[in-house]
């Protein structure tokens, strides 16, 4: 009692790969990495993708949840060294053509699926319980 638990998970869903890697994003990032994703899309013109993040806070028998999305496309090359995972190949639609890997952390946070999910969760926490 009196302890809160926050869980967050996210994935990259690429249209041209049947929404792969999706729930396997972490595994795919560790195994084939960014160049592997680029190679899989080499002959595929549909590079549209979406990052999705889900956040859940549980405390004293109550829970709040949220989902944040960031639509974009997969780059044809690795660009930038900031961030982690697929950041150097994901270009958000709401940006200026740079990958997340080319952005400062503050720029990425303003656009990212995780930032959106956590902002929505905070808004949900401020709302009265039903």
What label would you give each PLM region?
Residues 1-130:
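Anionic-ligand binding patches
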